[in-house]
């Protein structure tokens, strides 16, 4: 049996559960990095990115300029111009900082957040989140195979793996150093 990375929907939920378990077991760092790069391109297109020369971009570049890679993964930093207070990192080394966060923090505090995000890249936390997403999908598919009320609830799949990935929160274990 060869399982590819294409997201396919099989007619029987039990088969889909098997495929998702196999995907979770076979997921590689390289594959997660490719998916992360696609996700970041999408996010960058959906947000106002501070251009070179923007005060936010210059501040972040000044603070992060010496950090070029973590465990061989090239880092790239950008600022999203929004009032939201957030920052995130993805498996491909992309780190995005929101201007609303930058407005509230001094340089040392901001670098503590950036360092924290770099830790997610270093620890390969995204691959664990993706494995959990595939296993959750497998569990929903398995419930769908049962039929009845559980099957009907599972039939909606309670969201896709992409949604889980996009909204994945790192566990407390991943948040501690």
Report each predicted region and the residues it spans.
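A Zn2+-metalloprotease active-site environment signal
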Residues: 1-177
């Amino acid at each position: 049996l060869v399982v590819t990375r294409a997201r396919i929907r099989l007619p029987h939920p039990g088969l889909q559960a098997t495929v998702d378990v196999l995907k979770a077991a076979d997921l590689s760092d390289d594959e997660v990095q490719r998916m992360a790069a696609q996700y970041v391109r999408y996010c960058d297109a959906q947000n106002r990115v501070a251009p070179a020369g923007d005060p936010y971009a210059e501040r972040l570049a000044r603070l992060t300029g010496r950090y070029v890679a973590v465990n061989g993964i090239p880092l790239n930093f950008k600022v999203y111009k929004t009032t939201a207070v957030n920052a995130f990192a993805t498996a491909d080394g992309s780190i995005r900082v929101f201007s609303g966060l930058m407005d509230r923090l001094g340089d040392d505090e901001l670098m503590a957040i950036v360092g924290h995000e770099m830790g997610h890249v270093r620890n390969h936390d995204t691959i664990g989140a993706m494995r959990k997403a595939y296993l959750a999908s497998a569990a929903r598919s398995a419930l769908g195979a049962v039929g009845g009320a559980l099957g009907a609830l599972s039939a909606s799949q309670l969201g896709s793996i992409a949604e889980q990935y996009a909204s994945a929160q790192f566990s407390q274990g991943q948040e501690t150093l």
